[in-house]
A protein has these predicted regions:
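ABC ATPase C-loop
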Residues: 158, 423-424
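Conserved ABC ATPase "signature" region
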Residues: 119-136, 384-402
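ABC ATPase NBD Q-loop/coupling interface
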Residues: 18, 61, 71-82, 324-347
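Conserved catalytic motifs of ABC-family nucleotide-binding domains
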Residues: 161, 427
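Catalytic Walker B motif of ABC-type/P-loop ATPase nucleotide-binding domains
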Residues: 165-169, 431-435
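Conserved beta-strand-loop-alpha-helix hinge in the C-terminal portion
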Residues: 221-244, 483-486
């Protein structure tokens, strides 16, 4: 790939940042030097400011919209003046996809950087091939799954051949096999480019062969640990694990099963398929599954196999193209054998709690507390009871300190916990969750497993679409494996 940039250096001295409307600093007194060509894994608890730091290094913060202190430089320049030196993959890939077709998305950044027209499409094709993008240039971006969006966004980033590669959870939406492929692609890319690499990931062990340094930050503070991976984890592993940092080969303990009440069938899906409008192929091939109380079911499979689509069908939010999804009598008395997609929004809110793959798509209010009150109010709960539930969930999911914050200003992990809390606010009998562990640190991951296990043991049904094998093993009683696209 031509037009390579020299590896970039990062220097932070006493640097800090505070978001609008927040009393607490997201980061403060950050002292950090990353030399050209170094490969650093950036770790920290959920909400520690990892994404904020990457975005700042990329020069994407509006100086008029945030408060900063100290110095942050990329190759001796303010980050906003060095934007052409870096390439950033966002935590939410959909938020950076702006073009209608895949090829145009990859070409967009190259055009903005004035790459000669006769060189653009060769670089586009090479980048798409490098990430094993499963479609051609003309694939509509709106038709991509979350994992396919992640591949496309990475292709667009790599096509720039940046001197500084900033990756925020680059494999979070990918199945384990695809994640391994992408790690290999990134390793080969930084070898070829000689680029400086800073990556945020919770799959720590898998990235250790690629990085030569680990940097750990804390919420509201700065760097608390920094060094070669083996040395750092040997000296600080136990302490870091206690604060929520993921440590290689040390998963949190799974919850023990309690005594279960008798199982009842809540939802039955028979031979269901779904095809999105204007598509020529089914997003979900014919699938049958039943969801029962006191049971957790994991939906797993490769990227693009239809996990998110099946989750929406089971939650009553999509109507099948073929087949049926019907409610059991145990889900709502008097509504047994009715198509779930025919229920009103209020009925669904009372009986089915849903967490989307992109949690910000379900936020409708201006504060975390109001978001938790919305569902109970729609379901007809009295205000005092709704307030009690909201307060309990704020504490249980470590969101109490963010009660007045705007949901759209939360970190990815905090947004995911808020979406889980919102799904639980109406005390539904059925929970359908899409990638609920995205962005969670070791501590909040374990707490989420224990919370969902307790709900299952209390007689609820839990259905999760997930790429997280550890989460599947810790929670699921039954696993449904989906294949590739039909």
């Amino acid at each position: 790939m031509t037009g390579l940039s020299a590896p970039a250096a990062i220097v932070a001295r006493g640097w800090g940042i505070r978001q609008p409307g927040r009393r607490a600093w997201a980061l403060r007194q950050v002292d950090l030097v990353i030399e050209p060509g170094e490969r650093a894994l950036l770790l920290g608890p959920s909400g520690a400011g990892k994404s904020t730091l990457l975005t700042a290094i990329a020069g994407l913060h509006d100086p008029a919209a945030v408060e900063t202190e100290g110095t942050l430089l990329v190759d001796g320049l303010e980050p906003r003046l060095a934007r052409d030196r870096s390439g950033l993959l966002f935590q939410d890939p959909e938020s950076q996809i702006v073009m209608a077709r895949a090829g145009d998305e990859v070409a967009f950044g190259l055009e903005n950087r004035c790459v000669p027209a006769d060189a653009i499409w060769g670089r586009v094709d090479a980048a798409l091939a490098a990430v094993d993008f499963p479609y051609g240039r003309d694939r509509p971006t709106h038709a991509l799954s979350g994992g396919e969006q992640q591949r496309l966004a990475l292709a667009a980033t790599l096509a720039l051949a940046p001197g500084l590669l900033l990756l925020d959870e680059p494999t979070a939406n990918l199945d384990p096999d695809a994640a391994a492929e992408i790690r290999s692609v990134v390793g080969q890319a930084v070898d070829r480019l000689g680029a400086t690499l800073v990556v945020v990931e919770h799959r720590v062990g898998e990235w250790l062969p690629i990085v030569d340094r680990v940097v750990v930050i804390e919420a509201g503070g700065g760097v608390v640990a920094d060094g070669p991976p083996r040395t750092l984890f040997a000296e600080h592993g136990a302490q870091l694990a206690a604060t929520g940092v993921w440590i290689p080969d040390q998963p949190p303990a799974a919850a023990a099963r309690g005594k279960l009440p008798p199982a009842e069938t809540l939802v039955i899906a028979e031979d269901v398929t779904y095809r999105y409008p204007d598509e020529v192929r089914d997003a979900l091939a014919a699938t049958s599954v039943s969801l029962r109380s006191s049971e957790a079911v994991a939906l797993v499979g490769p990227t693009g196999s239809g996990k998110s689509t099946l989750a929406l069908l089971l939650a009553g939010l999509l109507r099948p193209s073929h087949g049926t999804v019907i409610a059991g009598e145990a889900l709502a008395a008097g509504r047994g054998h009715e198509p779930l997609a025919g229920w009103s929004a209020r009925e669904l809110a009372r009986h089915v709690g849903t967490v989307f793959q992109d949690p910000e798509h379900q936020f409708l209010t201006g504060s975390v507390r109001d978001e938790l009150l919305l569902g109970p109010r729609r379901a007809g709960l009295a205000a005092p009871e709704a307030a009690v539930r909201a307060n309990e969930l704020l504490e249980r999911l470590r969101l109490a300190h963010l009660a007045q914050a705007n949901p759209f200003t939360l970190s990815g992990g905090e947004q995911r916990r808020l979406s889980v809390a919102s799904a639980l606010a109406t005390a539904p009998r059925l929970l359908v969750l899409d990638e609920p562990t995205f962005g969670q640190d070791r501590r909040t991951w374990g707490e989420l497993v224990h919370l969902l296990s307790a709900l299952r043991d209390d007689g609820r049904s839990v259905c999760v679409a997930t790429h997280d094998r550890a989460f599947e093993h810790a929670l699921a009683d039954r696993t449904l494996r989906l294949g590739g696209r039909s």
